[in-house]
Amino acid sequence: MGGCYSVAPEHGPRIAAVGGGTGLSTLLRGLKLYTKNLTAIVTVADDGGGSGRLRQDLGMPPPGDIRSCLEALANAEPLMAQLMHYRFPEGTLAGQSFGNLFLAALNGIMPSFDRAVESMSQVLAITGRVLPVTTADVQLEATFENGASVVGESHIFRCKKEQDCRIRRVRLIPEHPRALPAAIEALEQADVIVLAPGSLYTSIIPNLLVDGIVDAIRRSRALKVYVCNVMTQDGETEGYTVSDHIRALFKHSCPGLFDLCLTNSSPIPPAVVQRYALEGAEPIFCDREAVEALGVEIISRPVATVENGLVRHNPGHLAWELVQLHNQRNIRLVCRDSHRTTCNRVET
């Protein structure tokens, strides 16, 4: 990472980031430094943990991933941020996040879940917007290469380990839920669309299965970037290369959905690699020729760091590289348009 970026965040690029889980919230923490014109479009297929309990008890969409994104973009007082992140240590609320409960309470007050998210956004004075990809009550079903299937995002890991084969396809039940109109609008108007890092089959792809999302991405004139994970994920993507990730994305959407794939070039210490291997994960191999054969350009940059033995995308480095990709594209477009104008003048 180098150079400088002098554009004020108020005038930064319009960025729509699609995903869920830790990967999306990590990305948002970096992007908010460069633009206020930011929209997070978040999956609602989670059915495990505290989110799953609230979903089952209250019949509401799972709040966890959305709450994490709100926390990442919050500009509230430190005590408020600490409160939203607080998890109850024991009793019937053990493991439950106060932020989840707060959003659940707002959902009971407001006429719709997206309005509840909007209200929580105001309380936390967030940068940009956070939107559920849909307000429909959806479940995720995974089908494996041996024909077995399982319903429920939280059950996929266990079932995949039992079946000992790759995931062939995932789908939403019911199929083709309607996307939130504001999410469609954000994608259509974006300068940059980012498929965030995160769990391939349970955080990223579920968004693409919502009716209208893929079409909106295709229609958009934005720069479209997929940020590939640094490590494979036990229970989802063991043995996957970069091209395997892209094939899965295209299989669940359409070929050529994005222009670029951003991968990590930072070295990972051997001791860290060995520790991850014990947990069934490894660095994702960048099979460049196979990726380019799919019509996707590979960009490798040092966007990951190791902290406390964990490999993570660095929010600032990742956001910087995405903003630079946007700037470079704009320069190319300006040069192209300038060349065309000059040619037209010569011809006349």
What are the functions of these language-model segments?
Residues 17, 40-41, 226, 263:
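Structural beta-sheet core signal
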Residues 2-11, 29-34, 42-59, 179-180, ...:
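Conserved phosphate- and dinucleotide-binding cores of soluble alpha/beta proteins
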Residues 2, 239-348:
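C-terminal functional extensions of proteins
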Residues 45-164, 321-324, 328, 335-347:
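Electropositive, gly/pro-rich neighborhoods at or near active sites that engage anionic ligands
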Residues 8-9, 14-18, 26, 33, ...:
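Metallocofactor- and cofactor-centric catalytic cores in central/energy metabolism, strongly enriched
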Residues 138-197:
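Active-site gating loop/helix substructures
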Residues 18-22, 196-199:
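Glycine-rich beta-strand-to-loop/alpha-helix junction loops that act as flexible
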